[in-house]
């Protein structure tokens, strides 16, 4: 194991996660302390990750040994003023119980094998797993299958990008670029993310707002940044009337944080369904919105028109773009929306897991593993993410999905629904290994 790329334990602090997970944990602690949930890992890549199972199991078991330290609580008290004292005190008693909460194995579906990770338990006690487990899966894969990557390559790639970024910003006279590093979940390794943040802070401090990772925010004295994720909205589909779920989620988030952290993702259902619920009260109360799927230019135009229709000056609002961005796309968006709205970027894999088409000795080109962990059930009921990008949609129950679309006047492809029902009947998931 190359110590310049990897460390013996992947996760060594419970703060080594995305800040929005702890934010949502507080809201759940307040509103839904007894709600049960199930999460599922989804491997979007064609690559079979089942061979990583044993090493992943060991790393997830290690999570059970970690606790929030006094220093962790003190840091959050000082740098996360939106977190209430009573909630922070409750973190002192928090710990994972992986042997009860996490089921791992290999699923056989359609004649192929794939890694399966299922997380179950109370929402409050399991919500922090997502970022940690994704980082574990990504790094185990890196050290088992791509250990021969030159240790200096990730930083070389990044520095080339930063040189090009600085030159383009100067050449084009762009003055509205800023970014938050959001690369924890799909990073090549923890050490690479550390090196990336050190490089960003040294090379472009004027454009780096902070990082979504509490652990590295503390280490590099950066601002920890995070608001809310699709999960909050998905859970409400099972907790209130489906048609009211989006508005209730938006309202309760404002209540949970007294109006702070008011940046809303718009694509849990689709941008059009979101705008139908994003009334003048909510549009005023929220500082801005986040784009995570679909065409960002059309999305931004639609959001600006919505604010104008409500009589709200869009230049007072913030648009955050976080959908698989690179610097070229970000600068195009800077130019397109200049003077029309405040913008910023959440950039992840492009920073923490890009090896610039590097190939191993066998000639295989490196590609990051595309994975997500998403809420599948809440209180034993299915939930869904529809998205503005079909490949990002997810729901285990096609009947529930069809009903949800009907309730929100989202177009339903009946032929696709019939095909999915036939496919589920023909090819149910078959678990051939579990622990």
UniProtKB/Swiss-Prot annotation:
Q: Does the keyword Isomerase apply?
A: no
Per the UniProt record, which EC number(s) apply here?
A: 6.3.4.21
| InterPro entries attached to this UniProt entry | N/Namide_PRibTrfase, NAPRTase_N, Nic_PRibTrfase, Nic_PRibTrfase-Fam, Nicotinate_pribotase-like_C
Gene3D superfamilies recorded for this chain?
nicotinate phosphoribosyltransferase
Record's comment on post-translational modification:
Transiently phosphorylated on a His residue during the reaction cycle. Phosphorylation strongly increases the affinity for substrates and increases the rate of nicotinate D-ribonucleotide production. Dephosphorylation regenerates the low-affinity form of the enzyme, leading to product release.
Residues with PTM Phosphohistidine: 230
Query: What SUPFAM superfamilies would the database entry show?
Result: Nicotinate/Quinolinate PRTase C-terminal domain-like, Nicotinate/Quinolinate PRTase N-terminal domain-like
Top-level EC class as recorded in UniProt? ligase
Any GO CC annotation of this UniProt entry: cytosol
Record's keyword terms, sorted: Ligase, Phosphoprotein, Pyridine nucleotide biosynthesis
Q: Pfam families, from UniProt?
A: NAPRTase, NAPRTase_N
- Reaction catalysed by this chain? nicotinate + 5-phospho-alpha-D-ribose 1-diphosphate + ATP + H2O = nicotinate beta-D-ribonucleotide + ADP + phosphate + diphosphate
According to the UniProt entry, its GO molecular function terms are:
nicotinate phosphoribosyltransferase activity
Q: In which pathway does it act?
A: Cofactor biosynthesis; NAD(+) biosynthesis; nicotinate D-ribonucleotide from nicotinate: step 1/1
A biological-process GO annotation: NAD biosynthetic process via the salvage pathway
What is the purpose of this protein?
Catalyzes the synthesis of beta-nicotinate D-ribonucleotide from nicotinate and 5-phospho-D-ribose 1-phosphate at the expense of ATP.
Q: Which family does this protein fall into?
A: Belongs to the NAPRTase family.
The protein in question is named: Nicotinate phosphoribosyltransferase
Taxonomic source organism:
Vibrio cholerae serotype O1 (strain ATCC 39315 / El Tor Inaba N16961)
């Amino acid at each position: 194991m190359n110590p310049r790329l990897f460390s013996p334990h992947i996760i060594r602090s419970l703060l080594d996660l995305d800040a929005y997970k702890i934010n949502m944990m507080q809201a759940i602690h307040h509103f839904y302390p007894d709600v049960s949930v199930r999460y599922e890992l989804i491997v979007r890549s064609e690559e079979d990750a089942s061979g990583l199972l044993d090493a992943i199991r060991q790393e997830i078991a290690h999570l059970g040994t970690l606790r929030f330290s006094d220093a962790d609580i003190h840091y959050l008290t000082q740098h996360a003023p939106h977190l209430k004292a009573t909630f922070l005190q409750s973190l002192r008693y928090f710990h994972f119980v992986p042997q009860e909460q996490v089921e791992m194995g290999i699923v056989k579906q359609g004649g192929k094998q794939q890694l399966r990770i299922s997380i179950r338990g109370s929402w409050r006690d399991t919500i922090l797993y997502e970022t940690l487990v994704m980082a574990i899966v990504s790094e185990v894969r890196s050290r088992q299958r791509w250990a021969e990557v030159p240790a200096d390559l990730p930083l070389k790639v990044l520095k080339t990008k930063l040189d090009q970024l600085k030159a383009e910003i100067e050449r084009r006279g762009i003055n509205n670029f800023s970014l938050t590093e959001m690369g924890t979940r799909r990073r090549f390794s923890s050490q690479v993310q550390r090196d990336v943040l050190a490089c960003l802070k040294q090379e472009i401090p004027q454009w780096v707002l902070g990082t979504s990772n509490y652990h590295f925010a503390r280490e590099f004295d950066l601002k920890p940044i995070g608001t809310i994720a699709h999960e909050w909205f998905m859970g409400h589909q099972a907790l209130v009337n489906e048609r009211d779920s989006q508005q209730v989620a938006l309202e309760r988030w404002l209540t949970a944080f007294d109006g702070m952290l008011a940046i809303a993702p718009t694509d849990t259902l689709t941008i059009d369904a979101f705008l139908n619920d994003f009334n003048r009260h909510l549009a005023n109360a929220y500082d801005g919105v986040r784009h995570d799927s679909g065409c960002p230019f059309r999305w931004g135009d639609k959001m600006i028109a919505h604010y104008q229709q409500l009589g709200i000056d869009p230049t007072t609002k913030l648009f955050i773009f976080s959908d698989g961005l690179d610097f070229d796309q970000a600068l195009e968006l800077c130019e397109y929306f200049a003077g029309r709205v405040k913008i910023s970027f959440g950039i992840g894999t492009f920073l923490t897991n890009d090896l610039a088409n590097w190939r191993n000795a066998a000639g295989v080109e490196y590609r990051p593993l595309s994975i997500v962990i998403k809420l599948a059930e809440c209180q034993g009921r299915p939930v869904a993410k529809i998205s503005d990008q079909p490949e990002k949609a997810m729901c285990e129950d096609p009947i529930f999905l069809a009903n949800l679309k009907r309730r929100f006047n989202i177009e339903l492809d009946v032929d696709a629904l019939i095909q999915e029902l036939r496919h589920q009947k023909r090819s149910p998931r078959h678990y051939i290994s579990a622990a």
